[in-house]
């Protein structure tokens, strides 16, 4: 069984008297920094001097400094920067200030697990990862609740790494819901697999394949959009609220029968074998190497595919139909 930690297992005293640098002020950065501050902890946000978010963080009542200045001040450094720039920023702006006994932490294990960042042996290294987007982390904290999270220790120099990590998790509200103990390897590899095979890559290709199949067969693109993309939210919401069983209970018997009989023809053994291959390429570092190499040459393949995907007919049809949906945020 996975070990789960709650409020009673965590003590904010392990962070009292320590300065916490939160590097980045995006989705997770703003939520974590504000919640830590509201938990009575000493926080500084680290940003580029020319960052558009500098004034936003100041307006939110937070101390802001450049990344090197924030790291120089802090005993705990939380790196909430995009995966592809963390290695460079670490080498240039974090490592010079990572003195003995400090703590280096992350909310995703990519750069530690794949060796893009190799911290000195005389610091703590751990991970605290809320399992929700930043706006929900912040909202739940403000309501006196929390979202589930993960905690992992990569390096325990001081003997207090897990205590500090759990204190941080408590400071952002996660221990109210429960914090699951994991490892950098498990967090990183499962996160990447979920994104690639299911949540992003898998779902995107399934939607487009369904849309294309209907349009190629002569059906109206608008009908194809409704059936293969728009209604997905209705199904996902049911799954999110109560699992696959809730969804199957809520749909018609015809839909449920089609689920059981046809689903395995779409995701068949060939698909499952390809998923196993995708996982192997994550585990052996192939994906990480490809992504790092892509960034080193300014992402030509990434940018070309991104542009091509933006020009898929489903985007034009969807833009028109969403104009007819006043409940959607523009």
Swiss-Prot record:
Q: What class of enzyme is it?
A: oxidoreductase
Please name the catalytic residues of this protein: 108
Kindly state which keywords UniProt assigns to this record, in alphabetical order: Amino-acid biosynthesis, Branched-chain amino acid biosynthesis, Magnesium, Metal-binding, NADP, Oxidoreductase
EC numbers: 1.1.1.86
Q: Which residues form the KARI C-terminal knotted domain?
A: 183-328
Record field: catalytic activity: (2R)-2,3-dihydroxy-3-methylbutanoate + NADP(+) = (2S)-2-acetolactate + NADPH + H(+); (2R,3R)-2,3-dihydroxy-3-methylpentanoate + NADP(+) = (S)-2-ethyl-2-hydroxy-3-oxobutanoate + NADPH + H(+)
Database matches in InterPro entries: 6-PGluconate_DH-like_C_sf (IPR008927), KARI (IPR013023), KARI_C (IPR000506), KARI_N (IPR013116), KARI_prok (IPR014359), NAD(P)-bd_dom_sf (IPR036291)
Entry's transmembrane regions: none
Q: Could you tell me one molecular function GO term of this UniProt entry?
A: magnesium ion binding
Question: Which residues hold Mg(2+) 2?
Answer: 191, 227, 231
- Binding of substrate, residues: 252
Instruction: Describe how the cofactor binds.
Output: Binds 2 magnesium ions per subunit.
Q: Which residues bind NADP(+)?
A: 25-28, 48, 51, 83-86, 134
Which prosthetic group or cofactor does it need?
Mg(2+)
Q: What does this protein do?
A: Involved in the biosynthesis of branched-chain amino acids (BCAA). Catalyzes an alkyl-migration followed by a ketol-acid reduction of (S)-2-acetolactate (S2AL) to yield (R)-2,3-dihydroxy-isovalerate. In the isomerase reaction, S2AL is rearranged via a Mg-dependent methyl migration to produce 3-hydroxy-3-methyl-2-ketobutyrate (HMKB). In the reductase reaction, this 2-ketoacid undergoes a metal-dependent reduction by NADPH to yield (R)-2,3-dihydroxy-isovalerate.
Q: What is this protein called?
A: Ketol-acid reductoisomerase (NADP(+))
The organism named in the record is Desulforamulus reducens (strain ATCC BAA-1160 / DSM 100696 / MI-1)
**Gene that specifies this protein:** ilvC
């Amino acid at each position: 069984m996975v070990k789960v930690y709650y409020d009673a297992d965590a003590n904010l005293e392990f962070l009292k008297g320590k300065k916490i640098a939160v590097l980045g002020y995006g989705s997770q950065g703003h939520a974590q920094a504000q919640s830590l501050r509201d938990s009575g902890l000493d926080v500084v946000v680290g940003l580029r001097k020319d960052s558009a978010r500098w004034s936003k963080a100041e307006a939110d009542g937070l101390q802001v400094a450049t990344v090197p200045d924030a790291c120089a001040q802090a005993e705990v450094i939380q790196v909430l920067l995009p995966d592809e720039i963390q290695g460079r920023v670490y080498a240039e702006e974090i490592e010079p200030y990572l003195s003995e006994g400090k703590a280096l932490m992350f909310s995703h294990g990519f750069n530690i697990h794949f060796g893009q960042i190799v911290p000195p042996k005389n610091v703590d290294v751990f991970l605290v990862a809320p399992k929700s987007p930043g706006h929900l982390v912040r909202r739940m904290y403000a309501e006196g609740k929390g979202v589930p999270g993960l905690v992992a220790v990569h390096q325990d120099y001081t003997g207090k790494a897990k205590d500090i990590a759990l204190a941080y998790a408590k400071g952002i509200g996660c221990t109210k819901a429960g914090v699951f103990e994991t490892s950098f390897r498990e967090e990183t590899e499962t996160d990447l697999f979920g994104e690639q095979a299911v949540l992003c890559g898998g779902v995107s290709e399934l939607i487009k394949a369904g849309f294309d199949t209907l349009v190629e067969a002569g059906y109206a693109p608008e009908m194809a959009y409704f059936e293969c993309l728009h209604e997905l939210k209705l199904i996902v919401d049911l799954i999110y609220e109560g699992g696959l069983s809730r969804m199957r209970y809520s749909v018609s018997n015809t839909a449920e029968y089609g689920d059981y009989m046809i689903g395995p023809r779409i995701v068949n053994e060939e698909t499952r074998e390809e998923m196993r291959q995708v996982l192997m390429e994550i585990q052996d570092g192939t994906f990480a190497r490809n992504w790092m190499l892509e960034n080193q040459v300014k992402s030509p393949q990434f940018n070309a595919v991104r542009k091509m995907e933006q020009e898929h007919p489903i985007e034009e049809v969807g833009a028109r139909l969403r104009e007819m949906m006043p409940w959607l945020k523009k």
